Amino acid sequence: MSIRDAISRDDLVELARKVASFKSDVDNEGELAAFLASRLRHQGIEVHDEDVVAGRPNVIATVPGRDSDQLPLVINAHMDGAYHLTGWSRDPLEGWIEGDKLFGAAISDMKGGLAAMVATIEAASRQRDLPRDLILQAVMHHDTVGLGAKYVLASEGPYEGYGINGEPSNMKVYYAHGGAVKFRITVRGQAAHVSRIEDGVDALQAAVTLYQKLGSMTPTGKRIEDLPDLPTVFVGVLNGGFAAGCVAPTAELYGDIRTLPDMNRKTVYSDLAQIIDENRVPGCEYEIKITAAQKGLLGKPQSTIITAIDGAFRKVRNQGAEISKALPTQAFVTDGADMAAAGLETVVLGPGDWKYAPDEFISITDMHDAALIYLQTAYELPLR
């Protein structure tokens, strides 16, 4: 049997359409998790599904290898998937095909990658000749903090081996990406009617000043060659006030800083506090709240896992893997960071060129090739 026959392209497409039909965008991975666990168990695969919080489980599937002493390969995908809610030409929960494109809700981030990894573990179960254990971690609540991945890695590992995180990297291999710190700044002033503006303290104007300054701030952090475009600072929400004829008593900014390895919530908080101190408006009170934080991934451009993936690419695509450190994946946050922190030699490799937009799609060829490459990598990794 040729490598390409190990996983049916048509079956994978139908699986991906089914996965995309589950609405799992906001705290609601339970139905998708139940479907995956049932499907895998029906094929005789060892499955552990455990609630991380009520109704929101991880699904961990394991296909044992011939030799349990060999280092395992972990493939990781998240089940939560946000998607653009308006502007679609068809129902996003009913995926459709046009040429090599599969359209559907959250199909590139990362329902397509998840389906590819499920197909990989199923194919490994059928072949029954893996040299090492292959573990699928289908996790809940990736969004920034990676709660599902942190839970399974802390509770059962593995703490040694290799990992592939399947976030959409457009089939390029990334060994490094930044972290993230998200924040909210609340400004409190004093309300006043438009006829008595002098009695008020305008929180919205104070927040606008911060918005302008934050856009040009340079966070404290040591620049590194592997993450040349970081750090970045972005404020995505600015709101305040409650009436057209009233001085705004409160305003809020919500921002996102993509970080370098020596940056963390404490350094970001300090940088934000300095910006506030330099632009403080008399009569205003300021509050900083760090709302989420996640570490980055910093591996090496030459590693055992990259060599194995390159070998898999050559067998599946007749060409080597492309190693990249470019945007946008450089500014992603992935569960690969937690996999590496747990002790796994980890890279990011997944199908899809992610864009949060209506009519989101994924290349069917890339999705199929990704599944085959994940499977072949388990064979390419060296024995010890």
Where are these regions (language model features)?
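A structural signal for short hydrophobic beta-strand segments in well-ordered beta-sheet cores
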Residues: 47, 61, 95-97, 235-238
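Short glycine-aspartate micro-motif
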Residues: 72-74, 102, 159-165, 182-184, ...
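Acidic-glycine-rich active-site phosphate/pyrophosphate-binding loop
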Residues: 82-98, 160, 175-186, 347
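Metal-dependent amide/peptide-bond hydrolase catalytic core
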Residues: 1-7, 48-51, 83, 175, ...
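N-terminal helical capping/dimerization or prosegment-like subdomains
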Residues: 2-84, 250-254, 268-271, 364, ...
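Active-site metal-coordination/substrate-binding segment of hydrolases
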Residues: 70-138
